Amino acid sequence: MRQIAARGAWALGLLALSSCATPAKRRGGDTHAAFLTLDAHLDTPVHFARTGWSFGDRRTYANDLAQLDIPRMADSGNLDGGFFVIFTDQGPLTAEGYSAARDFALKRSDEIDATIARFPERIGMARSAADARRLEAGGKLIAFKSIENSYPLGEDLSLLGEFHRRGVRLAGPVHGGTNQFAESATDKPRWNGLSPSGERWVAEMNRLGMVIDASHASDAAFDRLLALSKTPLVLSHSGTKAVFDHPRNLDDARIRKLAAAGGAICFTTIYLGALNMTPERAEVFGKHDQMGQMSSAEQADLTVRTRALDARQPMWSADFETYMAGLLHVIKVAGVDHVCFGADWDGGGGIAGLEDIEAHPKITARLRAAGYSWADLQKMWSGNLLRILQAAENGSGN
């Protein structure tokens, strides 16, 4: 959902650690900390190049714009890991645009690697489902890499292999604007779903053993991805039209088709209600992607401005109760074997009552109160993602 931040100007136009190891979780029992928890879409790498900011330092929602860090992940088992996103905003479909996007995406990939490498006793990179289990057994947090928007590949699908070599295991073809591969849910149709290059992209994703992410794809693109992929799809951060009718959300019929094909929808906190993108919000939010060029004092000032605006004028017209209603609906439609979590932390996600990852145990408690077992919760919090990742690995070479 990083287009909210990256397109602040666009929105305005529309409107006129320490060295100790993380303790291993106690498995079994009756708390959120009892099982492995993963999020399919973490935009936190946007913070990794910030001056004076460290992923290993504890922060709070009130005093920093980041919605997770290593200490908050480890506390009470809030979050054991997830897919750290290489996000690239959509640009022109030209050689120059592709080149700039490629360079940006490779740099962001390097920033993720460098950040995780600073804390080898606390978190590790994963390239497979087995890696995740190994890191879990060693009491470490887990970092996968993913691509949001395959625009940086340009017209050279061999670059997908390069990103795979660098550890990317999940990728989506498109983001906020229709590109060379697929139609965006929030842009005009062009390809009847996927372009010929997009169909080749699907085949290459399958050959490499990478999971296809259908979030941000139009309904027509979703249909083609589902029809063409030889392995199950994931929607890393999507919602349901039953709660809020928005192009980024999926209707019940498609959720059922996704489940029937073995895929999963990772329920999100965005587009559960209307987006309140006022001129003031667009101006402030548009600066978030510039944090890497800001001094620590400028970052602190932006945090104060953002949190004051959040209190006075929330960005989303939804709250924790809205979220739970949507989540319970998706579980009912898809089944516990086909639901996962992708809140869109640090990419525009977060709502009243669910502001950062420290609220994760509330979700587990409410699902338990709704009658879901610990086995159900284990599937939804990580098991389904790892199953789909393993299926993609098993299908590689085909």
Give each language-model segment a name.
Residues 1-9:
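Bacterial N-terminal signal peptides that target proteins for export
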Residues 21-191, 245-398:
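N-terminal hydrophobic targeting/anchoring segments and the immediately downstream early-domain regions
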Residues 151-154, 165-249:
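Divalent metal-binding pocket/active-site signature
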